[in-house]
Amino acid sequence: MSTIFNDTVEAAAENPDLEQPYAELGLKDDEYARIKEILGRRPTDAELTVYSVMWSEHCSYKSSKVHLRYFGETTTPEMAEKILAGIGENAGVVDIGDGNAVTFRVESHNHPSFVEPHQGAATGIGGIVRDIMAMGARPIAVMDQLRFGAMDNPDTQRVLPGVVSGISHYGNCLGLPNIGGETVFDDSYAGNPLVNALAVGTLKVDDLKLAFASGAGNKVMLFGSRTGLDGIGGVSVLGSASFEEGEERKLPAVQVGDPFAEKVLIECCLELYQAGVVVGIQDLGGGGLACATSELAAAGDGGMRVNLDAVPLRAEKMSAAEILASESQERMCAVVTPENVEKFKQICAKWDVTVAEIGEVTDEKDRYLVVHNGQTVIDAPASTIDEGPVYNRPVERPANQDEIQTLGGLERPDTAEGIRDAWFKLVSSPALCSRAFITEQYDRYVRGNTVQAKDANAGVLRIDEETNRGVAISADASGRYTRLDPRTGARLALAEAYRNVVSTGARPVAVTNCLNFGSPENAGVMWQFKEAVHGLADGAKEMGIPVSGGNVSFYNQTGDEPILPTPVVGVLGVLDDVEKTIGNRLPAGEQELYLLGETLDEFGGSIWQQVSGAGLSGLPPQIDLANEQRLADLLVPAADLVGAAHDLSEGGLGQTLAELAIHAGRGLDVDLTQVHEDLFTALFSESASRIVVATTRGDELVARAQELGVPVTRLGVTNDSGVITVRGGDLSVEVSVEELHDAWSNTLPEAFGHAVGANSVVE
């Protein structure tokens, strides 16, 4: 980043024609012209930096705003009734009753994780955790959604071990359980992996904190780690279409995290909240101090004056632009009344957290002033910095969309031997094999409140030890489905996350999302994006659960080739008593197995299509969200009817039966004749709205399912044979559970065994 160390507002007025490197900072010609129009002069170096940061896609949502508004338009008053903080805040906050609230959010750290996988992923965890802290909450868990290229791709071999070690190191050091996630391999993510991190926290309803600067004379306090040169340009460079290193210094655009500093910062924040000394608070993440202070000012009822000379630094002779744009981690910014400043400092000192008074709220509405070396380097309207431009970019259905929606030829084995071979091919594939190699590097049970995590439908946490109240969380996405039909793909992601939560017996209450797409300058990508947003928003409305917040990540592409459009959807559910959680492990003794839902011939975008080498074509499975709600109506009030439940998604019934048998080490004897007339279709179709349940009260289950209009089919029984026997029509297929387990569990260690992370317990 090119900087002029003493470029002041006065100097900018005196030197109006100075050439400035705005394009290197991600600004377009018309944006630079607009900034000069707003200021009535050329911007100072610091102003140019702040506008470039705040007008980046990451901070301003300038290409997505026009479409994201649809979430608000489709949210009814009834849906929003329990939302305490929603879209536009650091994280969504949901009132779950008894004076308790839960906050959750998912965010991307894609581009930094490609450049420096360990630190990129680690600071992704740190950043999303601070978003939770900024709502007044205690973080209690994290999850991740990961996408990589093919296993044997050199980039995947480099990036995956670093990403996993970064997530495990930061999360484990924080003492936060990692309660679930997804890892997907597809060629489209080679050169552009996706690292989406989700965090969840708890708070009392009355303890909610928001990001605004209110009350003239109130002080602006910066606390946490010192400000250095790491992360400069993170949102304006790494979050844009190109990566440019600075001319004078090759500043690192990837942040460096210290989880132990963040762990202390969490406790410090919680004590500050408890002491009642915080008026407003904002974390320092993407955009650093520039983003935090300008957002606080824009959201408040006055203006703000910031003194950069008071900012604690860990590098000498940093310019104003560098101080403002630094994305050094583990920092927070708070607004505090003058009488509480001393108490604020005392609490920070108790936790050995560096703190400085760096400014104050003024009575000059919307005026954002920044001083460095005693001179004014920024004098601008805060609202123009915060709001940014709004683009209604061209939207056009791709010319090849009809072609890709035509299902190509697909191999369909019709012999027992062929089906058996296909089954092994699927369970051992990169798409469906065991993720233990990754997940065993995460601590899933630290803090002692994890009820369900390993191989679970959804992560389940106890949040109140007195009442046993808890939450279930799942995050899901399918880029393959979304490429075939973006609207349906987003609805399927919502449906799967919803179904995973329901499978634990929890009642879904809110949705979050992270929308990962290619370049917004590509009309086809913007069509995908708009369709996905509408599919997700309409789906949430149909289900009556609000979208509480989200994140957008654009420019995910290699050259001109975008990734598969990947809308990650997270669903939060509430359990009145976690002791009644439905697990997904088969209990001991004979259990009857039932399939809830209907199986159709649906292989468009399926894993079998991918594994068999048939490419990507056809239409994704049909989805009627009313069917998902009927499943919820069946399972949530009557969790005691079933001993275990496992949703069906990728790999279909065959994958679910395999996982049930593998996890329990038990045999199954099932007849799929009533599921579908074709055994291969019965096993591997990926029809939505299906769950397998185990029960000893089959008659009651069937009666209740029929009463609610849920299709129900008896599959068979569990046993201790160590064999899965599947019949359908004239065919009978037998597979050894031990052999399935070996095929399922060896794929990842064989591909990445040379790069086991430092925190791994895998042998």
Swiss-Prot record:
It comes from Corynebacterium efficiens (strain DSM 44549 / YS-314 / AJ 12310 / JCM 11189 / NBRC 100395). One of its GO terms (molecular function) is magnesium ion binding. It catalyses: N(2)-formyl-N(1)-(5-phospho-beta-D-ribosyl)glycinamide + L-glutamine + ATP + H2O = 2-formamido-N(1)-(5-O-phospho-beta-D-ribosyl)acetamidine + L-glutamate + ADP + phosphate + H(+). Keywords: ATP-binding, Cytoplasm, Ligase, Magnesium, Metal-binding, Nucleotide-binding, Purine biosynthesis. This is Phosphoribosylformylglycinamidine synthase subunit PurL. The active site is at H58, H109. GO terms for cellular component: cytoplasm. The gene is purL. It is an enzyme of class 6 (ligase).
